[in-house]
Amino acid sequence: ERDKGNFTWDDVDQYVVYAQEHNQTILATIWPHADWEQKSCKRKKARSAFGKRFTKYLSKPCSMDDYKNFLLKLVDRYDGDGSNDMPGLTKPIKYWDVMNEPEFKMFFKGSKEDFIEIFNFSSKVIKEKQPDAVIVMAGAAGMFPESKKYWKVVLPKIKDNFDIANIHHISGPDGQCDKQLWVDEFAALLKSADVDKPIWLTEAMT
């Protein structure tokens, strides 16, 4: 949404078409940041890890109503319900990953409470629009001490609003990989938060 109410789907459509042609299933990551919207309440610019093609802002939406409108338009285009779908859609998007590694400031400039609000809000909006949607937890960036500390606080407050837990295998400063891809420690953290859900590893550094 480059401007309020002006939705441009070309880039996303290309990914969806490619996935359909190659029989791939999409896990779509939702970023709740639009430049025009963040400017409206004078959010501070941020340096993105993804360069110039990505948003210059990484804060909580200024207006959750505007964000909800974006979410509804997004899901409506790719849910495969036959209404307002992308032309030629044959393989709907069912799996939605709400945000990415929010404990890293290069991906999210907000508090734990901000993330919790955005995540729970997004999940409920998506499920209302697409009842069979599967919500994937924003990927945890490994199980380093700071990540564990972050998710220990956050997990109990979002656990009712996701279907699949999500861990990313991030190597340490020494470049060494965790032999269990962090899944063992992540499973223990989930158990401590009374979360009993499937675990997906959606990023891996080797």
Feature-to-residue mapping (PLM):
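Substrate-binding cleft and catalytic face of glycoside hydrolase catalytic domains
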Residues: 1-162, 166-172, 195
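Catalytic-core region of carbohydrate-active enzymes that cleave or remodel glycosidic bonds
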Residues: 164, 170-206
